[in-house]
Amino acid sequence: MKIAVCIRQGLDGDISPFDACAYEEALKIQGAEVILVSMGAPSVSDLLLKLTRLGAARAILLSDKAFAGADTLATAYALSLAIQKISPDLVFCGRQTLVGDTAQTPVMLGQMLGYGLITNVMSIDRIGADTIECTTRCEGAEKATIPALITVERINTLRLPRLRSKLGVLEMWNAEDVGADLSRCGLKGSPTRVLKTFENQSGKRKCTFISRDKLEWAIEEGLKRSEEQAYAETENNGEKLLKVFTVTDAPMDFAKTVSDNVTDIGFAEAEKIAEKIKRDDPDAVIWGSDTCSKRLSSQVAVVLGLGLCADCTRLECENGELIMYRPALSGSIIAKIKSLTRPAMATVRTDSTNAHQKIIVAAGFGVKDKMDDVRSFADGLGAELCATRKLVDNGYAQYDSQVGLTGKTVSPPIYIAIGVSGAIHHIAGMQRSGTVIAINPDKDAPIFEYADYGIIDNF
């Protein structure tokens, strides 16, 4: 059994957290030959060599100036050439990186390879001679025919090297080594373009500090004005696209801000959706942010060779083209992006909030030792209980309750953040909430910059 594990170096110079989980899952499979594959600058070789001490026999680094500036489609193309050369039985990838945060590249890679695909894996249940069976976050039990590619959630902790562990073999491959078509590589082969980036100021509010006994009043005030809150934060400069498709009605509100002619074409197999897009030639195709939409959109992008912008929070029409805005680098910046291919395609941050759910209580790491009290408080309000990534990562809450860049997006009329520091990747998942109330003993906590009402107090 040969397993290739795709690795991306994070901004901190270490392995991306989701990729670390994918690597650990590969190392657990007895008798498997594990090969690390990455694309980047020559300096990434140091990280790969260090990681081979954990058990990988080989590490392969794709490094060439021709690969620089690649978007997800061009990255998947380069990786697919390396994977074809390695010819593994299985390919393991992390669900997404924290650099691009798109979750597109692994799915695109699987589509290009023609491999079986299982995404959002929570556990690997069985690997047979011809199939792999997994439990996934959204669909439950799934099976794929080998060769297959799986994407792994944050389900484990990567082991540490043993005292006398040995380094594996490092190979560096350039574009010529993998037989790359240079027109499909790097910036030249990327169908999306970042026009500019700027600091992410979205979601910031003017916080009014109140005493603890005013909490009930603040909730009532928030509920009164909840009907005035806009669902999508997209602005419209008056220009419109002639024809736009949505895949399901989830992104309809976003689509209507850039076109008066919007058609919901619904879910279907990737090839059938691609056929309809090619035949009807819309200006843009807008997808939701649910797991199925993210997977299908990436597959359709490969079939049609289209650019795909992920997790957009704002859309505009400019000179007859769709302009897309999305957070990047863990939400710290906003990128303004256009597609060089027609139609433009984007997934947008659709809402996971139950339509009848008026209040969400979010627990942060600051109340990790008071979860029973927080849960009772939420139950008393009839509220849904959610959590930050740090609380989930440390085992105090379930993943399906996580709000943020690597969790779900919510926008309830009332969002009460308790013990939440206000990390930008959490803000990305709740910034469209109606009224935000923050409770934190630290008066300088960033969460207060994104709250309407603040209570400086322990819970």
Model regions: which residues?
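N-terminal glycine-rich FAD/FM-binding segment characteristic of electron-transfer flavoproteins
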Residues: 1-459
